[in-house]
């Protein structure tokens, strides 16, 4: 009878309908894994696994470059980015490339350069991936011991972790350098409606930076998602950069303590599960950030947040009716509460009507009209600028409400356009990906723990009906 498992390891296997199928010598009989199990066949082949990872990086970078050029080719400067279904150009614009006051795109050439650089990089990665997958050594331990590893070698694994942390720290510092020295980044809070500026007064106080982590995640607090000035964002990246770099050096120079050796499972599949768990957390945080935060994700490029569009509608009609003679300070709505303005339970003046639920919105077009006790009535009567009216009217009709294949905007709004907000796309995709990565984390963690406990995973295949059926071919 066929052996349905590898003698070299205790991974469960799937049985091919056609057991004679062989793929480049890495077949089920020799590896314990069917062809569709992909990189699982390469668990003990460090050279081939390197090729798979480099090729994967090439695919990722190729998508970034190709999609970047696709968005450049379709970009219409006269329309806002968020009305054109763009998800990459807003990121480049946020970094200060190609834009000027008010988020107006002045030059698309930097976006073209970005796309070409990514395409060239993807070609290099692609060739490297193909080389290591097909031509390079199957294992690295003999020829290149620095790059070789054994999954159970705890010291080597933490060294690899340290190298990754240092690279992440360098990435954080690159943003800091761009903001401080290389042209600055886009600040939606710059006076007059946003502009590109260099960050000159970093927030480095640990009380402020780490205070975000201690905040409640709920309304009015908002955990780290509530950050609303670039000094805090860039200062946070300085802290993150140092933590990652010094943490990386620590992990390279030290060996895991006894408690860590006991607490963790030390196998390739366990490391996969840890990585998927971390990516899941990142996905959920990114979802909340892009949905609620209009500083890291400026509304000029990504469209308004949900609360921002709602408050913009209240503001737009306050402006209109005030011009028509309404006394916005005292007019009553159908419920007896203020039609345009009302007081929150804590006494602040806020917009009335249904948008009262979004009382804690902060947006650059609205904040100049606030006083010490909320919205200032005298400023609402005398100080509203044309750019604030234009921006709120635009945001009112571009709420991030549409499902991914619908006519977006507010369903009852006659001025709505066929539009889906990039915030909807990015928040939805990151939530869904975060969820699936979490499921993958649970799956691989369960398998890794079972293997470490020493029992076979999967079900007994001996009596599986498919084994007695005629092959499909």
From Swiss-Prot:
It is a multi-pass membrane protein. This is Photosystem II CP43 reaction center protein. PSII is composed of 1 copy each of membrane proteins PsbA, PsbB, PsbC, PsbD, PsbE, PsbF, PsbH, PsbI, PsbJ, PsbK, PsbL, PsbM, PsbT, PsbX, PsbY, PsbZ, Psb30/Ycf12, at least 3 peripheral proteins of the oxygen-evolving complex and a large number of cofactors. It forms dimeric complexes. One of the components of the core complex of photosystem II (PSII). It binds chlorophyll and helps catalyze the primary light-induced photochemical processes of PSII. PSII is a light-driven water:plastoquinone oxidoreductase, using light energy to abstract electrons from H(2)O, generating O(2) and a proton gradient subsequently used for ATP formation. The gene is psbC. It is found in: Plastid, Chloroplast thylakoid membrane. It comes from the Eukaryota. Pfam families: PSII. InterPro entries: PS_antenna-like, PS_II_antenna-like_sf, PSII_PsbC, PSII_PsbC_sf. Keywords: Acetylation, Chlorophyll, Chloroplast, Chromophore, Manganese, Membrane, Metal-binding, Phosphoprotein, Photosynthesis, Photosystem II, Plastid, Thylakoid, Transmembrane, Transmembrane helix. The lineage of its organism: Eukaryota, Viridiplantae, Streptophyta, Embryophyta, Tracheophyta. Binds multiple chlorophylls and provides some of the ligands for the Ca-4Mn-5O cluster of the oxygen-evolving complex. It may also provide a ligand for a Cl- that is required for oxygen evolution. PSII binds additional chlorophylls, carotenoids and specific lipids. Belongs to the PsbB/PsbC family. PsbC subfamily. One of its GO terms (biological process) is photosynthetic electron transport in photosystem II. The keyword NAD does not apply. GO terms for cellular component: chloroplast thylakoid membrane; photosystem II; plastid. One of its GO terms (molecular function) is chlorophyll binding.
